[in-house]
Regions:
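Transmembrane-helix boundary motif in ABC transporter permease subunits
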Residues: 1-8, 73-104, 117-125, 199, ...
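Glycine/proline-centered hinge or cleavage motifs at structural transition points of membrane proteins
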Residues: 191-192, 205, 437, 441
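C-terminal transmembrane helix and the adjacent membrane-cytosol boundary/short C-terminal tail
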Residues: 4-13, 93, 174-185, 189, ...
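Membrane-interfacial helix termini and adjacent extracytoplasmic/periplasmic loops
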Residues: 39, 48, 113-162, 196, ...
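Interhelical loop and adjacent transmembrane-helix boundary motif
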Residues: 3-8, 51-59, 223-280
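Early extracytoplasmic/lumenal segment of secretory-pathway proteins
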Residues: 329-397, 524
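Transmembrane alpha-helices
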Residues: 14, 19-26, 110, 163-174, ...
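Short membrane-interfacial helix/loop motifs at transmembrane-helix boundaries
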Residues: 3, 24-58, 230-235, 283
Length: 665
């Protein structure tokens, strides 16, 4: 008996540990959604401000609206198409049905990235073919002018979702059709029903559970999808999953915790309603069986499951209506500009202000990296007007004739840009770009975890800090640290110097110096005191400093990289006037002041840079620490020790790729 009791206790403990492992991340997420601070690892007190901020976040609300519209429309279309397809399969011979069902299962088993890329390529090929066809038609007639340029957007996103949802409906409806007695249809027709009447009154009621199940699966898959949406949404549409992904480029925003909590609670409530309904149904069946066994007359109880269904339907309808009202906006606009930049790299109030002042709608999306942005544009999977790449990528885009020349008479605020940031190597004649922000790359370290102030890149390769160093997960920056430590230029094309830098980096990795190669993860690790040293950007250090005052930043004595991110317009834009109007607005002094206070990166606008300390004091009601301002905007003598990345020759870029692959990150 004692052994059984011990086994029972052990089973319960094991089950408790399993559930704790499963739900601990969700519990932490919910707790930190009420954190007054911005960190996901440092508690700053209880607050509801992130839920309030969530409702006023236009990017999230617009993406919720898009997600709901795409999911609902694709579910309806997939449910109709999938149901008729399943009925068609039902009429086939067993052998043919088996073959077609196997083909139907391929999209569900196929990797999402394969589906996403293939659909993207299909749309690109079709649009290119359409452009040639429309141009030919327009060349010999003018009665009906066909648009020669089609781009990906809400339409392609909807088509993609319908395509991958249909197989789930077929999979759910098919078994219900096979369970149905074929004689029911014949009997209905013998009693005078037409085929259509038999279809609606006999077939549909029989397969209704399968249709509902397939539709729910389709809706769930559509809401949850990221990869396929990423490749087919273009620039004018962004789902919630895409927006959340974009928001994590810099850190896990507390707003993400808030919306994730709301999603979890919504699912939990729906599951509770479903379980209560099933519980009531089981109780009724039990009472019916007991009454039948005893021969007693059955009592007619009120059907609580029907009431619950009505309540659940009413609640869902109210929630859906509220979301559509809150998030809804007109998707039609005479003027629009499509912008792509980095995550958390703009004060969102500026977007709202620009739209109100100009009437131009802004489609704002984010990219993961310069390389990812380049690939997306090159593949034809994006229709951006304004992009904000870094210096070396700007040089590459200009070299490949992918940018449009700007008419600076339409951008008068360009005169406010300091001469320091004009005529740089990536755009020596100032034809294509307007600087957006600039900053430096350096070393962030925890003063309580190192032996003394860090002054050299040696610290990134020092065995005494084994397991406590975070190396940036970027081949150009990581190799730059090694090149600088060896006394070489970060723009060297000498293969022997790059091999030497690689050897230094590889030796440090193999000897356990690096805890990890990171990008966004650096925030949580450095703020939480989980690492001593990291290579990262000055502006992001200032963000981390708000949550961990033990952190310090240094530009090593050997020098570093100072970078400029600039606004430019793609050559094939259809909204040149709107793009230049957006660039001029962002280049203004007021916009630069607001942006500096939000992103902690220095402005190239000389007036904004001079006025920022006073602006900071006015907005935050405290003086700006001169040391912080010097980190944000280093003086000329510091920048003289730094270099701007140049666009390297193709052979050198290929060497970088080979070395990074050999490093095995």
């Amino acid at each position: 008996m004692t052994g059984r009791r011990q086994n029972s206790i052990g089973d319960r403990v094991l089950m408790a540990l399993v559930f704790l492992f499963l739900y601990a991340p969700i519990i932490i997420l919910i707790v930190f959604s009420f954190n007054a601070g911005t960190s996901s690892s440092v508690w700053k007190g209880f607050s509801l401000k992130w839920y309030e901020s969530l409702l006023s976040n236009r990017l999230i609300m617009n993406s919720v609206y898009t997600t709901l519209m795409v999911s609902l429309l694709s579910t309806i279309a997939a449910a109709i198409a999938g149901t008729f397809a399943a009925i068609g399969l039902y009429a086939m011979s067993r052998r043919r049905r088996t073959i077609v069902n196997s083909v139907n299962n391929i999209p569900m088993m196929n990797a999402d990235i394969v589906t996403g890329v293939s659909l993207c390529l299909l749309f690109v090929v079709f649009f290119n073919g359409w452009g040639a066809f429309a141009g030919w038609v327009n060349s010999w007639q003018s009665a009906v002018v066909l648009p020669e340029r089609l781009t990906m957007g809400f339409g392609t996103l909807l088509i993609a979702h319908v395509c991958f949802n249909i197989p789930y409906v077929i999979l759910s409806v098919g078994p219900k059709l096979r369970q149905m007695d074929r004689n029911l249809i014949d009997a209905a027709q013998d009693l005078g029903c037409t085929w259509m009447q038999a279809f609606w009154r006999v077939v549909i009621p029989e397969i209704k559970p399968g249709i509902v199940s397939g539709a729910l699966t389709a809706f769930t898959m559509s809401v949850d999808d990221f990869i396929i949406s990423y490749f087919t949404a273009g620039t004018s549409a962004s789902t919630l999953a895409m927006t959340i992904y974009g928001m994590t480029k810099k850190r896990v925003s507390p707003e993400i915790n808030a919306i994730s909590t709301l999603l979890f609670v919504t699912v939990l409530v729906l599951l509770a309603i479903i379980n209560l309904r099933d519980s009531h149904a089981a109780r009724r069946e039990h009472h019916a069986a007991a009454a039948a066994a005893s021969g007693a007359p059955m009592k007619h109880h009120r059907r609580p499951n029907k009431v619950l269904r009505r309540v659940a339907a009413g609640v869902m309808a109210c929630v859906l209506t509220a979301l559509l009202v809150v998030t809804g906006r007109s998707v039609q606009s005479e003027r629009v500009v499509n912008v792509c930049s980095w995550g958390e790299y703009i004060d969102e109030e500026l977007i709202t202000q620009f739209e109100e002042e100009t009437g131009i709608r802004v489609n704002y999306q984010t990219a993961e990296s310069n390389e990812a942005l380049y690939s997306l544009i090159k593949m034809g999977g994006a229709d951006f007007d304004v992009i904000v790449p870094s210096d070396y990528m700007l040089a590459r885009l200009i070299q490949e004739d992918m940018l449009a020349e700007l008419d600076y008479s339409h951008i008068p605020n360009f005169q406010l840009i300091d001469d320091t940031y004009k005529n740089l190597s990536y755009d020596p004649e100032n034809k294509y770009t307007v600087p957006y922000a600039w900053g430096t790359l350096g070393i962030i370290y925890n003063t309580t975890m190192v032996s003394g102030p860090i002054t050299s890149w040696d610290a990134m390769f020092d065995p005494q800090y084994a397991g406590q160093v975070l190396m940036i997960n970027n081949s150009r920056d990581a190799l730059a640290a090694a090149l600088l430590d060896l006394g070489y230029s970060i723009n060297t094309t000498d293969e022997s110097q790059l091999e030497e830098a690689f050897a230094l980096l590889k030796n440090a990795k193999d000897s356990g110096v690096y805890q990890a190669f990171v990008m966004d993860e650096v925030f949580q690790k450095m703020e939480g005191g989980n690492a001593a040293i990291a290579m990262y950007y000055a502006g992001d250090y200032l963000t981390m400093l708000e949550n961990n005052e033990d952190l310090a930043f240094v530009i090593p004595e050997e020098g570093s990289n100072w970078f400029v991110d600039a606004m430019c317009v793609l050559k094939d834009t259809q909204h040149m006037a709107e793009a230049e109007e957006w660039i001029n607005f962002i280049a203004s002094t007021s916009s630069n002041l607001a942006n500096m206070d939000y992103i902690w990166y220095a402005s190239p606008n000389r007036e904004a840079l001079e006025q920022y300390p006073a602006y900071y004091q006015e907005v935050n009601e405290e003086e700006l620490d001169p040391e912080i301002f010097q980190i944000m905007a280093p003086p000329a003598e510091t920048l003289d020790r730094c270099e701007i990345y140049e666009n390297l020759p193709k052979e050198t870029l290929k060497l970088y790729d080979r070395l990074w692959t050999r490093l095995g990150v």
